[in-house]
């Protein structure tokens, strides 16, 4: 399998690169800096082809497309993992800059990555897109008051809820083209952007996602999944 993974140099993204690579797959981790490219090349001597682009910028679409063309004719799986966290948990302290920054990465960044990988993805026999979402983007959970006030940022919850809608939009558009699109909550991960109640390492989360990708025989397109747990409500 040929796998494109955004945010591939740290946290969950790096662990996804590792687990797919360790199991014999070819990985194309997207990173923002030359330093990260060098580090990945040193870490993985073969079957790893770092892609250099900044998903916060529109030009990343062409950069992704052009670099992928140098390495491969097709991609089987796109994992949109790149993300940043918010800070403010009260509306009076929430500012437009923070909201804009998170929307830019979690939503526009996904759109840029999908556009950049589309030509290669469409050539796969079994193309898939996984958007790494979060339980915090679930309107159902929010409406049921599962998230204590003051514990989670406005901007992250809003950005992930918007990303979930984007997942469904992509699924609807790509359904007749054979491209499956799924949102995945990786678990409560202990990462730089992890929640206060995090209880799982990035490596554990990556392994759960990998096992689900490999073992799942059910079409989960248009679904919100927590690997090892089941389907979540939007």
Where are the model-predicted features located?
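Conserved Rossmann-fold cofactor-binding substructure of NAD(P)-dependent oxidoreductases
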Residues: 56-71
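C-terminal helical subdomain
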Residues: 161, 176, 183-184, 195-234
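Hydrophobic positions on the long internal alpha-helix
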Residues: 79, 113-117, 121, 166-167
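Conserved glycine-rich Rossmann-like NAD(P)H-binding loop of the short-chain dehydrogenase/reductase
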Residues: 23-38
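Catalytic loop of short-chain dehydrogenase/reductase
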Residues: 83-84, 88, 92-103, 122, ...
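N-terminal Rossmann NAD(P)H-binding glycine-rich loop of SDR-like oxidoreductase domains
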Residues: 9-18
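Rossmann-fold cofactor-recognition segment
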Residues: 44-59
């Amino acid at each position: 399998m040929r796998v494109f993974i955004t945010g591939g140099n740290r946290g969950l993204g790096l662990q996804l690169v590792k687990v797919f690579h360790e199991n014999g797959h070819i990985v194309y981790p997207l990173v923002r800096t030359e330093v990260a490219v060098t580090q990945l090349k040193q870490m993985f001597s073969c079957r790893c082809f770092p892609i250099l682009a900044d998903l916060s910028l529109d030009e990343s679409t062409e950069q992704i497309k052009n670099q992928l063309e140098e390495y491969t004719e097709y991609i089987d799986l796109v994992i949109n993992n790149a993300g940043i966290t918010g800070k403010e948990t009260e509306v009076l302290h929430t500012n437009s800059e923070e909201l804009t920054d998170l929307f830019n990465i979690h939503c526009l960044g996904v759109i840029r990555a999908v556009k950049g990988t589309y030509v290669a993805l469409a050539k796969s026999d079994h193309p898939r897109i996984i958007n790494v979402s979060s339980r915090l983007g679930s309107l159902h959970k929010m409406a049921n008051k599962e998230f204590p006030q003051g514990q989670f940022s406005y901007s992250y919850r809003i950005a992930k809820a918007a990303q979930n809608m984007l997942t469904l939009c992509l699924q609807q558009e790509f359904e007749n083209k054979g491209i499956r699109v799924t949102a995945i909550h990786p678990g409560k991960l202990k990462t730089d952007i992890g929640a206060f109640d995090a209880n799982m390492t990035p490596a554990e989360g990556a392994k759960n996602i990998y096992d689900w990708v490999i073992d799942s025989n059910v079409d989960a397109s248009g679904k919100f999944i927590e690997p090892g747990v089941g389907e979540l409500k939007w």
